[in-house]
From Swiss-Prot:
Belongs to the cytochrome c oxidase subunit 3 family. The lineage of its organism: Eukaryota, Metazoa, Chordata, Craniata, Vertebrata. Its EC number is 7.1.1.9. It comes from Mammuthus primigenius (Siberian woolly mammoth). Residues 35-40, 106-128, 184-190, 257-261 are mitochondrial intermembrane. GO terms for molecular function: cytochrome-c oxidase activity. This is Cytochrome c oxidase subunit 3. Its main location: mitochondrion. It is an enzyme of class 7 (translocase). The keyword Transmembrane applies. Residues 1-15, 67-72, 153-155, 224-232 are mitochondrial matrix.
Length: 261
């Protein structure tokens, strides 16, 4: 048995970064094949590889943080910094999309009829499904905070209830977004408006799905008594991510749905 005289976690060799990179290659190649040749085989393989990688990598990290006790206060501090940097990178990621939208909408080119929205594009009514989506995400922000406070107070039942409501609201948001896409009178091919609308809202929708998966993992972990009132960074990181998704949607709603229409 080996001993260490420091509080840091020396991570064991892992195959998951390699399989994660492979899944990213398969998914991007699969999307290209799907768009141009209507073949979903590569995309399906990529999604399957990504799901398996995600499940097994999460399993290893959970095992290290619970049963093996590797997540000391020093390690948790490092994880916090890592999550903050990750969310910062996501902020910059969405900044690029908002930049593209405002660049195109504040000074529309003659090709667009010098008009925004472009001639022939009929934007969605911001007071219908988009407003409902906004209320759903704001409600989920309240319930995730309720879950966090319940966890810190040691109230397991309320924490599970609030977390389950948050997950259901996330799923409901995704279904509403799918319905909205189906009903839209324009597509991603309809010029700069369609491109910026679907890419920005689509990536946000992807982040909602990722966040819902993150919260579902936390829900299962809480069922197995993995979290305590003072040792629950996995849940805290998921809550930070969810609040980030909320804030991005508010900017997205005000910019693209309300002002942009």
């Amino acid at each position: 048995m080996t001993h260490q005289t420091h509080a840091y976690h020396m991570v064991d060799p892992s195959p998951w970064p390699l399989t994660g990179a492979l899944s990213a290659l398969l998914m991007t190649s699969g999307l290209t094949m799907w768009f141009h040749y209507h073949s979903v085989v590569l995309l399906f393989l990529g999604l399957m590889t990504n799901t398996l990688t995600m499940f097994q990598w999460w399993r290893d990290v959970v095992r290290e943080g619970t049963f093996q006790g590797h997540h000391t206060p020093v390690v948790q501090e490092g994880l916090r910094y890592g999550m903050i940097l990750f969310i910062t990178s996501e902020v910059l990621f969405f900044t690029g999309f908002f930049w593209a939208f405002y660049h195109s909408s504040l000074a529309p080119t003659p090709e667009l009829g010098s008009y925004w929205p472009p001639v022939g594009v009929y934007p969605l009514n911001p007071l219908e499904v988009p407003l409902l989506n906004t209320s759903v995400l704001l409600a989920s922000g309240v319930t995730i905070t309720w879950a966090h406070h319940s966890l810190m107070e040691g109230n397991r039942k309320n924490m599970l209830q609030a977390l389950l409501i948050t997950i259901l609201l996330g799923v409901y948001f995704t279904l509403l977004q799918m319905f909205e896409y189906y009903e839209a009178s324009f597509t991603i091919s309809d010029g700069i408006y369609g491109s910026t609308f679907f890419v920005t809202t689509g990536f946000h929708g992807l982040h909602v799905i990722i966040g819902s998966t993150f919260l579902l993992t936390c829900f299962i972990r809480q069922l197995k008594f993995h979290f305590t009132s003072n040792h629950h960074f996995g849940f805290e990181a998921a809550a930070w991510y969810w609040h980030f998704v909320d804030v991005v949607w508010l900017f997205l709603y005000l910019s693209i749905y309300w002002w942009g229409s």
